[in-house]
């Protein structure tokens, strides 16, 4: 089953982003710090390429900081300004505003030099579903003006919000790519809750999670389930070991349905510890392979 989700409201929101872009000075893109490349919407990136932009690595409290730091450098080397935030706990949010003012300082200075009183900075926030845009906005404004829920598709329309006297923000719904370059992106976005579970092949996603864990966080996997597997073991074998530890057999068979749900839920509730799904060395290997 191919993972794909681009409902009508996302297509409409994409058109509206294009239309409203001329009204804004700067774009904020929220990505999930656990998969900053996979949750970076390259399609929207192309749409907003002529605007100044800040990429916000949100949920920084949930990621493997050492691995995510490599992705921060990756984006900065491409010319982006990157800011870490933990919106849920209100950490580093004001730095985003400070960076926006820095990015637009020359434009504001030119207006002042001409005797023009600078208006409030107009910004737009974009991102795939469930990366924490609404929480980010509510914490920044210090009141609940955007709907929040730990599931995709909660914000369905655009709205202008006043963050403070210096900056206004156009909130937009979560928008996915019309199609994924590869299914690994879809699986990672499924794991962070950007795609609805009821349209996702959770068995494939859970096996993919095992694949990532056994190569990058094997100790976390073994410690959580009190198992002793290696990165050479088959993913289905590892799932059997987890099922054996956590669930009784049903009619002689392992309870795979419960095990699949357990694995995904344990990731989403940080039972494996601090995890970054996007592995920077994988990107380097792919680039080297493409060059050859």
Identify the meaning behind each predicted range:
Residues 61-126, 145:
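Canonical P-loop GTPase G-domain recognition
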Residues 1-26, 34-42, 47-52, 66, ...:
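Helix-rich effector regions associated with P-loop NTPase G domains
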Residues 29, 55-57, 125:
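Structural beta-sheet core signal
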Residues 31-34, 60, 75, 140, ...:
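Anionic group-transfer/hydrolysis microenvironments
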Residues 95, 99, 135, 208, ...:
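Alpha-helical scaffold segments in soluble metabolic enzymes
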Residues 107-111, 138, 144-150, 216-221:
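Short, structured loop/turn "capping" segments at alpha-beta junctions
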Residues 122-142, 146, 172:
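Glycine-rich phosphate-binding P-loop
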Residues 57, 86, 173:
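Residues at the C-termini of beta-strands that transition into short coil/loop
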């Amino acid at each position: 089953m191919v993972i794909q989700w681009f409902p009508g409201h996302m297509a409409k929101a994409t058109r509206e982003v294009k239309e409203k872009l001329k009204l804004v000075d700067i774009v904020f893109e929220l990505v999930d710090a656990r998969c900053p490349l996979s949750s970076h919407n390259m399609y929207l990136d192309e749409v907003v390429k002529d605007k100044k932009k800040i990429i916000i690595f949100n949920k920084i409290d949930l990621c493997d900081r050492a691995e995510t730091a490599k992705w921060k450098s990756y984006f900065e080397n491409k010319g982006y300004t990157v800011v870490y935030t933990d919106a849920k706990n209100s950490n580093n949010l004001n730095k985003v505003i400070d960076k926006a003012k820095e990015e637009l300082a020359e434009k504001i200075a030119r207006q002042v030099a001409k005797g023009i009183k600078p208006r409030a900075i107009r910004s737009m926030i974009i991102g795939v579903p469930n990366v924490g845009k609404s929480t980010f906005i509510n914490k920044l404004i210090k009141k609940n003006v955007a709907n929040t829920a730990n599931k995709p598709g909660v914000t369905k329309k655009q709205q202008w919000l006043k963050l403070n006297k210096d900056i206004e923000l156009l909130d937009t719904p979560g928008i996915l790519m019309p199609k994924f370059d590869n299914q690994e992106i879809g699986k990672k976005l499924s794991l962070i809750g950007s795609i609805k579970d009821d349209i996702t092949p959770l068995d494939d996603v859970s096996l993919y999670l095992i694949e990532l864990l056994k190569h990058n966080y094997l100790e976390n996997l073994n410690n959580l389930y009190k198992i002793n597997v290696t990165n050479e073991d088959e993913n289905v074998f590892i799932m059997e070991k987890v099922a054996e530890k956590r669930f009784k057999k049903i009619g002689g068979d392992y309870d795979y349905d419960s095990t699949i749900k357990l694995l995904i839920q344990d990731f989403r509730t940080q039972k494996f510890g601090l995890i970054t799904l996007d592995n920077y060395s994988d990107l380097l290997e792919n680039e080297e392979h493409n060059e050859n």
